[in-house]
Amino acid sequence: MNTDNLIAHARARFDHVAARRVLKEKYEAKMLFAHNGGMWRAGPELLVLLATVPPGDAVVLDLYETPVQVNPEQLRGMAMMRWQEQMNAWLVEHEQLNRQR
């Protein structure tokens, strides 16, 4: 391989890594949602926390460590829906990005 090919390959690799990082940031931002006066990030941590909270109203800390009274079942349903929607969309874009590579 000549140096021009190596440089082109390195740039393409760097562009792919940068595009993956941008894609991750995009979908991490889309995981945020508001509910009951609190700000939440849909993800495994929130889903596991809400699965362990007993049924009925509970006080849970939101993203900004503000105590918020919520219905855990309702918040868990919203978080799960947001998580699945965004993860599915992220997967589609990630596969498209890998095909372009």
Language model segments and positions:
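A preference for well-ordered globular domain cores
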Residues: 1-101
